[in-house]
């Protein structure tokens, strides 16, 4: 499988000398479904944001599809960001626009600024958007405003928007943190199925350890900005869990279940 993402010795230190990431190195191949776990403040969100330079690392190198992202700016950075879709916890939709318009926004990186402002999407783009909305079972809501949707529906639209970008890598930052268990399962199923069908690499930050173990082909564990674990769900034993979270796997899953109650 081809390498989509390569990170070498990534460091991130904020101005107040807080170390968010230390010596993170990893590679992710096409089609991998990688869950990043760890307690709050472990560096999960910072790690994802260094990939597309929403957070600029203090040291190290990031490569997307063989091209270095670190230090890139202007047109080069925009071109590289086309290859990376992102799904956020809080949906990142334009609430006053329709579902269809929000999904079409996934094509803005391929358009001129003027065409983007005027909404001059191609007929092919419109057909792709409709097909994606059918795939996420939102085809009957094309012209509903995003503000009229439930949280789970908004996240489905966010997924379609990210896939509309035709990325090689999808970054998902706590996409089910605000959802109930039923909506969470729908969202996780969609992210997994849609990336697997298209051979898109996916890195997803999760607080829910049981969810990570159910879906991921690979799990990365962070604690205090350092990589503690990188392996398969089957290799994630109680000793590793205690090192990452400072508690047992059983206690962690019970506590997470109580948060859903």
PLM region descriptions:
Residues 37-39:
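The feature captures the beta-strand-to-loop junction immediately N-terminal to the Walker
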Residues 181-183:
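Helix N-cap at the start of a conserved alpha-helix in ABC-type nucleotide-binding domains
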Residues 145-149, 153:
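Conserved ABC ATPase signature
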Residues 170-173:
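Catalytic Walker B motif of ABC-type/P-loop ATPase nucleotide-binding domains
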């Amino acid at each position: 499988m081809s390498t989509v993402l390569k990170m070498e010795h990534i460091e991130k230190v904020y101005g107040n000398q807080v170390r968010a990431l230390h010596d993170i190195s990893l590679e992710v191949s096409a089609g991998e479904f990688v869950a990043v776990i760890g307690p709050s403040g472990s560096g999960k969100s910072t790690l994802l944001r260094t990939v597309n330079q929403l957070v600029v690392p203090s040291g190290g190198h990031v490569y997307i599809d063989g091209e270095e992202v670190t230090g890139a700016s202007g047109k080069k950075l925009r071109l590289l960001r086309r290859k990376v879709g992102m799904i956020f916890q809080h949906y990142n939709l334009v609430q006053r626009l329709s579902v269809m318009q929000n999904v079409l926004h996934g094509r803005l990186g391929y358009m001129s600024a003027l065409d983007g402002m005027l909404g001059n999407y191609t007929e092919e783009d419109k057909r792709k958007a409709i097909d994606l909305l059918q795939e996420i079972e939102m085809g009957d809501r094309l012209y509903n405003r995003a503000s009229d949707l439930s949280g789970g529906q908004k996240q489905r639209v966010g997924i379609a928007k990210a896939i509309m970008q035709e990325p090689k890598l999808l970054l998902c930052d706590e996409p089910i943190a605000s959802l109930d268990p039923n909506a969470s399962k729908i969202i996780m199923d969609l992210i997994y199925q849609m990336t697997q069908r298209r051979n898109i690499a996916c890195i997803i930050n999760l607080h829910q350890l049981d969810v990570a173990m159910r879906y991921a082909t690979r799990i990365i564990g962070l604690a205090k900005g350092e990589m503690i674990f990188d392996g398969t769900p089957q290799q994630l034993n109680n000793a590793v869990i205690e090192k990452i979270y400072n508690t047992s796997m059983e206690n962690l899953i019970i506590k997470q279940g109580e948060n859903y109650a």
